[in-house]
């Protein structure tokens, strides 16, 4: 008969937690931390002997909370100012990190061409090839200046990580963490002379990709399609809609 005895809980992931029991107090309480990895098996050892008693501990489900504040709508220009469109409304199209945006008419399925006028924020006639890009985060131009920025690729992955909470074909899909609702609408990618993937939801990230390219989110227009953030990217001279984020 020992005055005291050690109790050790061993996890299949290598973790160990211990306590000590005694004849006077044979019940041992050992606090096991939440499991942030995959399911693990906990085995109980008393005085160095495996009791063959086990408990399975499932993976802790961490609720999704967006790490940034998302703009209520896409970036657009209205009345000579950079503003956000309504939540389910299309914004303007921008080359990668360009201050100049342009609108495209409905229906997008007709793959409309660039109409020759950009807003920066003043309306200016400009050939598509002459629209500068790569030097200005257009989100930073929303008042108060410097508050908003383009989302990183990781933030786009976070936004779409739980898929759609709602999906209406050809209209919108909803991403939400329960606190913020972010609607994505069909938009495509403009080359100036045509619109590629007009029914898909596409938007720029702030991250450059391969040489001359930038990373972006693409989400096809079906209920079962998965969001994809490209690693290599697409030409920075193409144009997409832009969503903005700011610090919480």
Residue ranges and their predicted role:
Residues 33, 45-49, 247:
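Beta-strand-rich extracellular modules
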Residues 62, 68, 72-79, 86-92, ...:
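C-terminal, surface-exposed recognition/capping segments
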Residues 28, 38-48:
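A short beta-strand micro-motif common to beta-rich folds, especially ectodomain repeats
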Residues 8-12, 57, 138-139, 143:
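Short beta-strand segments and strand-loop junctions that repeat across beta-rich extracellular domains
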Residues 1-29:
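Surface-exposed binding patches on compact interaction domains or structured appendages
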Residues 49-60:
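Edge beta-strands of extracellular beta-sandwich domains
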Residues 22-25, 47-48, 234-240:
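Extracellular interaction modules
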